[in-house]
């Protein structure tokens, strides 16, 4: 059953991001693990693309432990906004560690730096994991401003984006801006993928 769910999620993500520049994914918390597995399998299946994965939800070390075998193609870079805040101090050449998830300007700067040196003909993708986690550390208005600015920059730079949000943790204003700034919204339900 788990593979069916993951395969269904991969197909929905692939279909959505191939025709839309920005995709918002709203999901219940209990589907988060399946969704992240589907995302990493999808990223791994696209070795000639460049991905930047911004994690506020889980430390890079735990992501590497679970999905590290999918990073060997060298097309996925990470920006970790949670490890340092949790007291985890590691160094990894594949990851930029931000001191705190409240440093939204620094996160934005590192995202744009990660894409800056790539060739123009490479398709670029950004994953934000997750908007709802940013709300734990930041005021709603700051997250709204950050996401609006990020969305505008990625569109100008021709970077496709996937923004995750956990339904149970979302504020109404952030949900509205996610709908406004995303070309496509995928709503994951527990019973239907």
Predicted regions: what is each one?
Residues 39-41, 63-72, 173-180:
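Short, aromatic/basic amphipathic alpha-helical patches
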Residues 24, 125-128, 162:
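Structural motif
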Residues 143-169:
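Substrate-engagement module of ASCE P-loop NTPases
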Residues 59-64, 86-87, 170-173:
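Short, charged/polar "capping" segments at the starts of alpha-helices
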Residues 87-149:
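Phosphate-binding/switch loop-helix module in NTP-utilizing enzymes
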Residues 159, 165-193:
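Phosphate-binding/switch region of NTP-binding enzymes
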Residues 2-66:
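Glycine-rich P-loop/Walker A and Walker A-like loops and their local beta1-loop-alpha1 context
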Residues 70-98:
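Nucleotide-state-sensitive switch-loop elements of NTP-binding domains
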């Amino acid at each position: 059953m788990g593979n069916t769910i993951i395969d269904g999620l991969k197909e929905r993500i692939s279909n959505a991001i191939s025709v839309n520049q920005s995709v918002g994914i709203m999901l219940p918390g209990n589907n988060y693990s399946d969704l992240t597995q589907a995302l990493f399998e999808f990223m791994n299946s696209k070795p000639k693309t460049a991905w930047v994965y911004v994690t506020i939800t889980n430390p890079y070390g735990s992501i590497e432990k679970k999905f590290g075998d999918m990073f060997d193609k060298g097309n996925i870079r990470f920006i970790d906004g949670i490890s340092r805040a949790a007291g985890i101090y590691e160094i990894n050449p594949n990851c930029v560690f931000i001191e705190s998830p409240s440093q939204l300007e620094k996160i934005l700067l590192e995202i744009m730096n990660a894409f800056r040196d790539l060739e123009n003909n490479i398709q670029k993708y950004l994953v934000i994991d997750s908007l709802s986690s940013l709300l734990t550390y930041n005021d709603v208005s700051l997250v709204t401003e950050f996401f609006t600015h990020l969305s505008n920059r990625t569109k100008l730079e021709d970077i496709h984006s996937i923004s995750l949000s956990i339904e149970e943790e979302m504020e109404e204003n952030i949900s509205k801006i996610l709908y406004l700034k995303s070309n496509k919204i995928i709503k994951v339900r527990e019973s239907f993928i």
